[in-house]
Amino acid sequence: MPLSKKSAISFIFITLLIDCMGWGLIIPVIADLVAELKHIPVNEASTYGAYLLSAFAIVQFICAPIIGNLSDKYGRRPILLLSLLGFGIDYIIQAVSPTYALLFFGRVVAGVTGASFTTASAYIADVSPDPTSRAKNFGVIGAAFGLGFVLGPALGALLSSWGIRAPFYAAAVLCLVNCVYGYFFLPESLPKENRREFDWKRANPFGSLKFLTHHPEIGGLALSFFLIYLGAQAVQSNWNFFTIYRFNWSEKMVGISLAVVGILIGVVQGGLTRIVVPKLGNNKSIYVGLTLYVIGLVLFAFATEGWMMFAFLIPYCLGGICGPSLQSVISGEVPPNQQGELQGSLTSLMSLTTIIGPLIMNGSFAYFTSNDAPFVFPGVHFLIGAICMLLGAIIAYSVLSKRPAKKMNAAGVPAMEPSVPSPNETV
């Protein structure tokens, strides 16, 4: 008996929740761990933290389209389980690592199998028949990440009192338990009749990016997508390093702040998105969300007290209504049997931002807190992020404002056009 769509969404929510808790556990301690292994101050350690993020992203960039195409051939379930197993192994390596080099190697291992977001996004697309439900269900992914970032950092902050490596062991256990749970309970979302053969041409990481230019709307919105995720790296890659340096935050305070981020993201993407998107439509949700992102980043840049970071998280996290709407518009342009390839391509774009972003954001932070800088400005990377978001908003508007009115329903949500793909269709 086929599972209901609601049950399928619940399965993927729980899977991503536990997976995200594992990553959230280690964020409060990773900055101090890198500083300890390299024997340098935390602002200098931010550069080495960027190398870890970039190493993971480079490998994921190469592997994501391969994983996406494999999920189109074999289904989402086995690929997702492999990803969880890889992350579990990565956390074990980091837990026992005596050197920065081994820590680096662990990130590479995780990059090879780091396809949970790619496969989960394709899974959501499989069980979401129309743009409105697709935007809402992509919001459920955000809610899982948000709740994971509430529980993960909070638990990581508590576990850090037992040692800087304790959160890594806990993260490994969570990922491996999640893998076992998924093996027994996670259903397959892609019917055999909607699968297609693996093709190395489609699995080429650079070739997969050409998929995004198959339709003009996808090409332009993909560039906006890239700039938005690049701007977000100002927060994602350097929050812990910045707050420890600027406000002398402890691991516990970093964990608490990230737990607050998780609560806000959960409220926005798990609840507010379901109310706002149907009323505003995808287009307006994108514009409003990006405006709030820019405001939040500019405020972060000039914060002078630690409490301000908590206050400024409100407009920044409210900007999260943008993401599900933008992804819904993009995914609505392709048929069901290409969703895995599309999500693999989008993940490749995200990986590119995680290759470039940390080097730019952490690098600018490290430089403007060093003796070589003409002046000290720790928040410079937030301004860079705001500029990226602003450019993304301009590009999104230029593309969406040219979309024919017949593609929009009464709610302002793009209506999906009929599409009958050939079984051997290639990009």
Language model: regions and residue ranges:
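Juxtamembrane intracellular "pre-TM" segments in multi-pass secondary transporters
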Residues: 1-4, 187-224, 245-246, 413-426
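Helix-to-loop junctions at the C-terminal end of transmembrane segments
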Residues: 63-75, 268-282
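Helix-breaking motifs and short loop linkers at transmembrane-helix boundaries and internal kinks
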Residues: 75, 96-101, 113, 248, ...
